[in-house]
Amino acid sequence: MSKPELKEDKMLEVHFVGDDDVLNHILDREGGAKLKKERAQLLVNPKKIIKKPEYDLEEDDQEVLKDQNYVEIMGRDVQESLKNGSATGGGNKVYSFQNRKHSEKMAKLASELAKTPQKSVSFSLKNDPEITINVPQSSKGHSASDKVQPKNNDKSEFLSTAPRSLRKRLIVPRSHSDSESEYSASNSEDDEGVAQEHEEDTNAVIFSQKIQAQNRVVSAPVGKETPSKRMKRDKTSDLVEEYFEAHSSSKVLTSDRTLQKLKRAKLDQQTLRNLLSKVSPSFSAELKQLNQQYEKLFHKWMLQLHLGFNIVLYGLGSKRDLLERFRTTMLQDSIHVVINGFFPGISVKSVLNSITEEVLDHMGTFRSILDQLDWIVNKFKEDSSLELFLLIHNLDSQMLRGEKSQQIIGQLSSLHNIYLIASIDHLNAPLMWDHAKQSLFNWLWYETTTYSPYTEETSYENSLLVKQSGSLPLSSLTHVLRSLTPNARGIFRLLIKYQLDNQDNPSYIGLSFQDFYQQCREAFLVNSDLTLRAQLTEFRDHKLIRTKKGTDGVEYLLIPVDNGTLTDFLEKEEEEA
């Protein structure tokens, strides 16, 4: 190897040292004493770097700078600096004995490197006369030697040698090495460098695997969150918040401004009807034309009734006026009975009484409803010339939709000289009839949508605008008691019977609680006074009973309904029983 000429006495000399010379420097064979352990040599002097703007460097130079920064940080713990100008040291300073670096220490340094920002250092590789890097073309394309010329009397820290995996990347462009190369390694140096590089590559692979394992322990990678996942997470969180807001336990405040608190007096039924009659209906011409089309069917209906069919009318709107026109037009000379099914006091017994008393002129009594029905059927079968037209408004009303009521009406309509024409308004009205009842009625269905208001049909219902009469609570009694248990209905029935038995007593103020409890206990309806009080509380909530205390402090029970309504209710209960 040619020795470069030294211009000054204190310049650093670079010699090639073989393997034998290295062993002689590590261990003195003659004296048998170990030499002082030194750190690795300095590859680059960071204090002699001439900075250059980053935009002058190319992309390959940027990668070299990143690796040089890593080399600078990894050499922080160098303890001694190289003595400049010492030519007598020879390979002692260049090939010093290195301490074995443990993988744990390198892992700690790597973790510190990941946590702390790196030091930005710029390198000038083109015009720096003190740093010369030669890149010979070897079999693996790695750099063989570096020439470093530090300044005199400068104390600089030495950087530890970087791993081979990083040193392989410290390659400058080919144009730099071609123009600034001073010497090339011989073939023998290439052969020896190949073996050394193979060993260093193996150590570098093991070192990089340990560093990756430590990094996985120190900091776990955070998965990237795509916009779709972020939107789904936000949507889920919003749904959760909406669920808890909807099911929160906070009290919901509602307004207490109801119609009951209006200071205006309630109207009677006639006044309300007069006010509604002054309102002109919309599309009056179209409604009149629609009713005229239905009136053209009257003769057809009469023919079908005489052929053994019965007619049922359905559709939106009240059909009471339509049936009334049919009665006045076609049934003037015929015997007919009109039944208002929407009336709260109507019952099957009242229908049968109307037939026996008004049509058949029978003033006697019957033991039961079935006996009365058999007598009517026999009378119409005996006299075939006797004809009767039954017009029933709202056959599906609350008072007539019972199974027993429908069975009795169906048997009457099955007679060949009794003609039935009825109307229904409930959507589920056909569910009242099974196959047996359908065969008795033998219906012909006609859609007669009139769009007329249900004025008469709803006049008997409870309203906040109209004063109620004494007969109105009967529908309320029926609705409430049908939703109760059989024992509850039996308790209320006992109270009704006792009140009707004492209706002629002017001093009657009600039934005492103790006497009523004794009667319910004898009828096996309750087993304790707590059960009876719980049932009376339900009656009181529906305003079916009223309690008051007498002068003796005893609690008395009273039903605030007129006796006629209570009598009709008991008769209806007996019919359904």
From Swiss-Prot:
Phosphoserine modification, residue list: 122, 138, 248, 280
Chief localisation class: nucleus
A GO term, aspect molecular function: DNA replication origin binding
Keywords: DNA replication, Nucleus, Phosphoprotein
Involved in LRWD1-binding repeat segments: 1-100
Skewed-composition ranges (Basic and acidic residues): 143-157
Entry's localization field: Nucleus
Disulfide bridge map: none
Stretches for region Disordered: 81-199
Record's keyword annotation contains Phosphoprotein: yes
Cellular component, GO annotation: centrosome; chromosome, telomeric region; heterochromatin; inner kinetochore; membrane; nuclear origin of replication recognition complex; nucleoplasm; nucleus
Biased composition (Acidic residues): 188-199
Phosphothreonine modification, residue list: 116, 226
Keyword Nucleus: yes
Matching Pfam families: RecA-like_ORC2 (PF04084), WHD_ORC2 (PF24882)
GO biological process: DNA replication initiation; negative regulation of transcription by RNA polymerase II
Subunit structure: Component of ORC, a complex composed of at least 6 subunits: ORC1, ORC2, ORC3, ORC4, ORC5 and ORC6. ORC is regulated in a cell-cycle dependent manner. It is sequentially assembled at the exit from anaphase of mitosis and disassembled as cells enter S phase. Interacts with DBF4. Interacts with MCM10. Interacts with LRWD1 throughout the cell cycle; this interaction, which occurs only with non-ubiquitinated form of LRWD1, prevents LRWD1 ubiquitination and hence stabilizes the protein. Interacts with POLQ.
Function: Component of the origin recognition complex (ORC) that binds origins of replication. DNA-binding is ATP-dependent. The specific DNA sequences that define origins of replication have not been identified yet. ORC is required to assemble the pre-replication complex necessary to initiate DNA replication. Binds histone H3 and H4 trimethylation marks H3K9me3, H3K20me3 and H4K27me3. Stabilizes LRWD1, by protecting it from ubiquitin-mediated proteasomal degradation. Also stabilizes ORC3.
Family in the record: Belongs to the ORC2 family.
Protein name, per record: Origin recognition complex subunit 2
Organism whose genome encodes this protein: Homo sapiens (Human)
Species lineage: Eukaryota, Metazoa, Chordata, Craniata, Vertebrata
Gene: ORC2
